[in-house]
C-alpha cells in the first residue's frame, strides 16, 4: 500500500514520520517543488524506520505517485506582508489548479486528502478541479476538524480523569473560529456526559464548558504564538485518516467534503461525521444537535460559503 505526500514542509514531513511511527502502509513518496528538501526529509525519516516499522520513504515527482492509494496534499504558498486572506486563497487556488490535475494524472484511483489551510475552502477547491477530470467528491477529503475533535475529547477526558478513547464528542463545521463543539452529544463509554458526572460525583458547569471551548478554539493560535506553526497534531491526524483509508476501516471521522444536502447544509465544504473507507467517504451523517448547535453549524457553513463565493471558481 502506497501513500503520496505533495508538499514536504512541516505538515507533510511530520505526516510521513507519523505514518512510519504508526506503521501505516508500505511505501511513502514525498513530492515537493524543492526536490532537495523532499530528498532530505525522506532520508531523515527513513533513518527512523529501524526504530519503528518497515516502510520505504522516498522522494520523487508526480510520476512517482503512480499506484498510490492515498495522496496527501499539504502544498501551498505562504502569506505575503500586507496580503489579504482572500488574495492568499486566490494564489493557493492557482497552486491547486496545477497540483490536483497532476496528482490525478498519475494516481487516478487515489483518494485525495487535503491538509492545506484553510482546509475547508481548499478541499472545496480541490474537489472542483478533481471534478473537471471526472473524480467524484467522495474521493476528495479534507482533514477538517479531525484534530479539533481529538483536542475536544482529550480535554474532556482530562477533566473527567477518563481515557479519551472512551469519550465520544465531535467538533463540526469550519476548521476555524466558527467551529461548533457539540456538547449535547458528548458521551463517556456510551453514557451521557451529565449522567456520567452525576454517577462519579464530578461537578461540571458552564465555566468548565467555556474553558474547554476556549482551549479547543484557541489551540492553534496558542501553539503558533510559541513556536510558529502546528504540525505534530495535524501530522498524526493525517496518519490516522490515511490508516482508515488504506485499511478500509469504515471509521467515523469528522473530515470535510463538499455537501450535497445534509441537515440543510449544501453547496459548501464543512466537517460532519463521515463514514470513511477505502474509496473515501461512504456516507455523511446528520448529527442530532440542539437548537443552538444547529444554528451555530449553519452559521459556520455560511462563513465558509461566503469565502468560496468570493473566489469565483
Regions found by a protein language model. Give the residues of each.
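C-terminal substrate-binding/catalytic lobe of Rossmann-fold NAD(P)-dependent dehydrogenases
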Residues: 132-139, 147-313
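Aromatic pocket-lining residues of Rossmann-like dinucleotide-binding sites
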Residues: 19
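Rossmann-like NAD(P)(H) cofactor-binding subdomain of soluble oxidoreductases
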Residues: 85-153
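A structured beta-alpha segment of the ubiquitous adenosine-cofactor-binding alpha/beta core
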Residues: 49-70, 76-107
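Glycine-rich Rossmann-fold phosphate-binding loop(s) that bind the pyrophosphate
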Residues: 8-9
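Conserved N-terminal Rossmann-fold NAD(P) cofactor-binding segment
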Residues: 27, 33-69, 83, 306-313
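Extreme N-terminal starter segment of soluble prokaryotic enzymes
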Residues: 1-3
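N-terminal Rossmann-fold NAD(P) dinucleotide-binding loop
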Residues: 12-13
Amino acid at each position: 500500500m502506497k501513500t503520496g505526500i505533495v508538499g514536504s514542509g512541516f505538515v507533510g514531513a511530520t505526516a510521513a514520520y507519523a505514518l512510519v511511527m504508526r506503521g501505516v502502509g508500505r511505501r511513502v513518496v514525498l513530492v515537493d517543488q524543492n526536490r532537495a528538501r523532499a530528498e532530505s526529509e525522506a532520508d531523515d525519516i527513513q533513518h527512523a524506520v529501524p526504530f519503528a516499522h518497515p516502510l520505504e520513504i522516498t522522494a520523487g515527482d508526480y510520476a512517482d505517485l503512480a499506484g498510490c492509494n492515498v495522496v496527501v496534499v499539504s502544498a501551498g504558498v505562504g502569506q505575503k506582508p500586507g496580503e489579504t486572506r482572500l488574495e492568499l486563497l486566490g494564489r493557493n487556488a492557482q497552486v491547486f489548479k496545477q497540483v490536483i490535475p497532476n496528482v490525478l494524472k498519475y494516481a487516478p484511483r487515489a483518494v485525495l486528502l487535503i491538509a492545506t489551510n484553510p482546509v475547508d475552502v481548499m478541499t472545496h477547491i480541490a474537489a472542483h478541479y478533481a471534478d473537471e477530470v471526472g473524480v467524484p467528491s467522495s474521493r476528495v477529503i479534507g482533514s477538517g476538524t479531525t484534530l479539533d475533535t481529538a483536542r475536544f475529547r482529550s480535554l474532556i477526558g482530562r477533566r473527567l480523569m477518563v481515557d479519551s478513547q472512551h469519550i465520544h464528542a465531535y467538533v463540526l463545521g469550519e476548521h476555524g473560529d466558527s467551529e461548533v463543539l457539540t456538547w449535547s452529544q458528548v458521551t463517556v463509554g456510551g453514557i451521557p456526559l451529565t449522567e456520567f458526572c452525576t454517577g462519579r460525583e464530578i461537578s461540571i458547569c458552564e465555566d468548565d464548558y467555556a474553558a474547554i471551548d476556549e482551549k479547543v478554539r484557541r489551540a492553534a493560535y496558542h501553539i503558533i504564538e510559541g513556536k510558529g506553526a502546528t504540525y505534530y497534531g495535524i501530522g498524526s491526524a493525517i496518519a490516522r485518516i490515511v490508516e482508515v483509508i488504506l485499511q478500509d476501516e469504515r471509521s467515523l471521522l469528522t473530515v470535510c467534503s463538499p455537501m450535497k444536502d445534509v441537515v440543510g447544509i449544501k453547496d459548501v465544504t464543512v466537517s460532519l461525521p463521515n463514514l470513511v473507507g477505502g474509496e473515501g467517504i461512504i456516507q455523511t451523517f446528520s448529527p442530532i444537535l440542539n437548537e443552538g448547535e444547529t444554528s451555530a453549524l449553519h452559521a459556520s457553513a455560511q462563513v465558509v460559503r461566503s469565502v468560496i463565493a468570493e473566489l469565483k471558481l
